[in-house]
């Protein structure tokens, strides 16, 4: 009977870990799972030693304010590992915490195999971490198709198991644009209140430059409709059916993140935006980007494609007039639209529709049996 210990520290990691637990139990029915995570992991059959509500701290200020809680979480995880003595430790994203736990496990439980599912984005920044990941982990299970080649440059191995977003969207029913309703612009302002409050007004103002188009704002799970109300004008719609809204829109304005990839896979031309605080430092950040980051892009669409497919209005370029100008091209330049949609098709081919969690579980269970 295999014992698996999983660590996810954020809501997205909880979601992916839960899918992995389900597959582990299907492929290894007698297995037991414990770890640190959220409600989805618990519902999938994982005994939790700590909940992500006590682990997910966003931003430097939040981390600084919660240093005591973070140290406590390390102690909880370390003691849980020693108590459980699992056959395998499975890490899901959450890099700073998980790399420390990998090091602890390697020293204290040398017989435990370590797997990193959804490894840190070392191809974007903190590239030196690639050596620690390869040294500490028995297998690295990536969700982007370029990751194996990136690791190979350093003499290490990484398995591409599939992309969960592409897998999910391959199952979403396609909804054709309805000629019976006015043409629309979809606004995807993000998933956290802070980023929505920073971005939504400028995103809406850019879309309002085209009054012939209906504006549909896609609400994030867990954020009440009342939060959006002050931003909306008469005739502007709030929806929680994001996938349908995006598929029926002529174009979209999207806050950078997984939503840009979702929008591309749903076939909607888009412009991406991203707010950076501390405006006096924005020019310096842009200048230093090649030194700090290993890639020239912010959005997953452009990173995966290896070139600019969608326009990125980031930092000081995130201005209403620039977003509106790009939106105008998306709405009215048919050649530009077709080129972007063709690039989306190539992107979809690169990602494939591999069942990521099932593939990762198969690798883990096979290695555990060997």
Predicted regions, residues:
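Nucleotide-activated sugar donor-binding and catalytic core shared by glycosyltransferases
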Residues: 1-370
